[in-house]
Amino acid sequence: MNKIKIKYYKNSCFYGEFLKSNDWFVFLDSCNDISGFGRYDILSSSPHTKITTFGNLINVRQGDNSSSFYDNPLDVIKKYFNFSSINSDLPFNNGMIGFFGYDAFEKKSQNNKFPDIAVGFYDWAIIVDHLKKESWLTFESKTDFISRIIKLCNNSDSNVNYNTEYTFTNFKNNTSYDKYIDDVTTI
């Protein structure tokens, strides 16, 4: 694992502005710039492997290759996850980031288009330590992509304008009120 110190910014949105349009961009924000209590922010994008599940239907995408099959989602994720330990003082170097939905382990009928599980396997990350006021770029191997990230992190203007305009769409419920009440009552 490689680790390079990069320029520290109190507001990690600076890095997010450059990365947000990348595939599967993730920003685990400690909200330190608002609360003063969070310590670490973690940013990454472009995972080398993406796994989404809908019940036992598994979709695996690695670069331009993809496959779909039925299996136990956790067994498949374990096959791709590298459990080797890395000696580092950082909370994350590379690995899996994603979500496990509430219905991921329930045998319910799929009633929406949102996956039960969506995880990416990332081989690089920007780690911002607000306590030490340091930022680090960690990565497996130096590629052209990583070289561009290093350049952006160290040679960027700190007066970047943050995009505060967002487009919202109408909220659409994926279940009826009666079905919702029935499900909550069951719990």
Question: Each predicted region: which residue ranges?
Answer:
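Signature of the chorismate-utilizing enzyme
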Residues: M1-I187
